Amino acid sequence: MGKLTGKTALITGALQGIGEGIARTFARHGANLILLDISPEIEKLADELCGRGHRCTAVVADVRDPASVAAAIKRAKEKEGRIDILVNNAGVCRLGSFLDMSDEDRDFHIDINIKGVWNVTKAVLPEMIARKDGRIVMMSSVTGDMVAESNPAASPRRSAGSRRTGGLPRIG
């Protein structure tokens, strides 16, 4: 039995990189997984983990769209039941100087890295409050506390993610 046996974890941005690593680690520790990603390729990771004996559901959603998030979470909960752990991992990083960054690039970062976290947390939190149980993990970076010259969009969005988390324990 693993440390997370009997717990269901929703991991956003689970297809690759850190999100995939979190999914594999949680699976090794016995968690039931809900893997959320914008890419339908997330099904392949879910199939692989299911093939290794882990309980796993893949859902495709765009974290920028609250309706997409709500529909995906509804589908996942119909299959997996409650969500015990939320890992807000989905994020993007387009490198470039501040002066070269377009308004579209700025909005892209904000929509995924700030609003996306907001949308997923808002969809999951009410049930956790009602149960008086649940855990939310916010992925961030040291760039929340410093400015990276090659990535001016990262610092504000990482800082926003880190700072927003502070008030959540007081809710409910």
Model segments located where?
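The beta1-alpha1 cofactor-binding region of Rossmann-like NAD(H)/NADP(H)-dependent oxidoreductases
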Residues: 60-72, 103
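Conserved glycine-rich Rossmann-like NAD(P)H-binding loop of the short-chain dehydrogenase/reductase
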Residues: 29-44
